[in-house]
Amino acid sequence: MNIVILAAGMGKRMNSALPKVLHPVAGQPMLSHVLDTARTLSPSRLVVVVGHGAELVRKAVGADDVAFAEQAQQLGTGHAVMQALPLLDDSQPTLVLYGDVPLTSVDTLKGLVQAAGAERLGVLTVEMPDPTGYGRIVRDAAGNIVRIVEQKDASEDVRAIREINTGIIVCPTAHLRQWLATLRNDNSQGEYYLTDTIERAVNDGVEVVSAQPAALWETLGVNSKVQLAEIERIHQRNIAQRLLEAGVTLLDPARIDVRGELTCGRDVTIDVGCVFEGRVHLEDGVSVGAHCVVRNTTIGAGARIQPFCHFEDAKVGPDGRIGPYARLRPGTELGQDVHIGNFVEIKNSQIADHSKANHLAYVGDATVGQRVNIGAGTITCNYDGVNKHRTVLEDDVFIGSDTQLVAPVTVRRGATIGAGTTLTKEAPADKLTLSRAKQMTLDAWQRPVKQPKK
């Protein structure tokens, strides 16, 4: 099968410099959603017709399996498909999709392709309560489709029809090539309509059949930011529905955003306002508090994530206790039963089982052993202005509050670092190491007194 995706439109009503098909739904361009769906049909030729912002579109979705055709002037959908003809295989049917209609399901497209077979022209249609703005499906007395009439060219009788054309069609490519060559632009828009091929098919004795999607929202397109927001909510609602059906507890299904792939084990609970980006996996019994942002992260079984945490490219071990207001940056790997508390930032560090940094700390480029306690205000001073250096804290180390660990530095097994220490050399095992200025009391000192204003 050939698949052609039309993605040349400017999208004036979007009021944006970004090509319309690159506006995101669930964190990825609308066009990427359409391409992902198209790929599940295993097409032999996959062609994207670009126009406005062509280079941006090529850069965003270019891949080895995608060919591009350019529509320099946007002269209608029929004209757009004409640009793809040199790239198509006449021995196989062609399916036409739209880069700004991102939610059409694979099952719906398979149903349309199956209905059309190898010799018929298939049209995806829906009935709408208010069909204003859409091309109407005109049938004869026997119920056969005879033509599609666009809204601006329709009579009052035709405008009363509620069955509309979604624009998605499939037909034999050799016929399509012949029909497109005969299109005229003598209509109110001055464009070459792809829908006019239906009347050509009828005249040539090619049967025209229709199929319908499982839900109306599958065929909704995006022409404005309002419609983009509506599509986003529909998509997120569908994701939430699938999560609920899989056994995930969502404290408010209307307040979750998945911008990638979220997989969950059993008995997972997600509070309101959470955002999941990229590939995220939550193992059995995980609880995620309100308003967390989690990107490309695995969270181990039984972990409890408190509200307002941010994770990116991280791994949380089983039974972890994280947050609130904790940040795990790329390269963070936490072992079992690790506690990371409020206003703690971890970056490119490995922290082994049962270790804790409960509040107000920065741990960067560090290797932390088991049962380590990192006191409040501890900082790994990992950057010298040019290079990053590592800090090593071996098992059973205790770091007192307000300690600066100036990397590269190692604290040996069982060592204790006194509060307020600036550590610049290795601390030996099982000993107390500290550095601090001599404490003094000045008996003759007087606090300055602020003079009253005159």
From Swiss-Prot:
Annotated stretches, region: Pyrophosphorylase: 1-225
Statement: the UniProt record of this protein carries the keyword Magnesium: yes
Family matches, as InterPro entries: Bifunctional_GlmU, GlmU-like, GlmU_C_LbH, Hexapep, MobA-like_NTP_Trfase, Nucleotide-diphossugar_trans, Trimer_LpxA-like_sf
Region listing for N-acetyltransferase, in residue ranges: 247-454
This protein's record includes keyword Hydrolase: no
Family that this chain belongs to: In the N-terminal section; belongs to the N-acetylglucosamine-1-phosphate uridyltransferase family. In the C-terminal section; belongs to the transferase hexapeptide repeat family.
Keywords: Acyltransferase, Cell shape, Cell wall biogenesis/degradation, Cytoplasm, Magnesium, Metal-binding, Multifunctional enzyme, Nucleotidyltransferase, Peptidoglycan synthesis, Repeat, Transferase
Cofactor(s) annotated in UniProt: Mg(2+)
GO annotations of cellular component type: cytoplasm; membrane
Top-level division of the source organism's lineage: Bacteria
UniProt-recorded name of the protein: Bifunctional protein GlmU
Record: residues binding acetyl-CoA: A376, N382, Y383, S401, A419, R436
Binding site for UDP-N-acetyl-alpha-D-glucosamine: 6-9, 20, 71, 76-77, 98-100, 135, 150, 165, 223, 329, 347, 362, 373
Gene name per UniProt: glmU
Annotated compartments: Cytoplasm
Protein EC: 2.7.7.23, 2.3.1.157
Catalytic residues as annotated in Swiss-Prot or TrEMBL: H359 (proton acceptor)
Gene3D superfamilies, alphabetized: Hexapeptide repeat proteins, Spore Coat Polysaccharide Biosynthesis Protein SpsA, Chain A
Record-listed Mg(2+) binding positions: D100, N223
GO biological process, one term: cell wall organization
Purpose: Catalyzes the last two sequential reactions in the de novo biosynthetic pathway for UDP-N-acetylglucosamine (UDP-GlcNAc). The C-terminal domain catalyzes the transfer of acetyl group from acetyl coenzyme A to glucosamine-1-phosphate (GlcN-1-P) to produce N-acetylglucosamine-1-phosphate (GlcNAc-1-P), which is converted into UDP-GlcNAc by the transfer of uridine 5-monophosphate (from uridine 5-triphosphate), a reaction catalyzed by the N-terminal domain.
Cofactor binding notes: Binds 1 Mg(2+) ion per subunit.
Entry's Gene Ontology molecular function annotations: glucosamine-1-phosphate N-acetyltransferase activity; magnesium ion binding; UDP-N-acetylglucosamine diphosphorylase activity
Catalytic activity from the UniProt record: alpha-D-glucosamine 1-phosphate + acetyl-CoA = N-acetyl-alpha-D-glucosamine 1-phosphate + CoA + H(+); N-acetyl-alpha-D-glucosamine 1-phosphate + UTP + H(+) = UDP-N-acetyl-alpha-D-glucosamine + diphosphate
Species assigned in the record: Cupriavidus metallidurans (strain ATCC 43123 / DSM 2839 / NBRC 102507 / CH34)
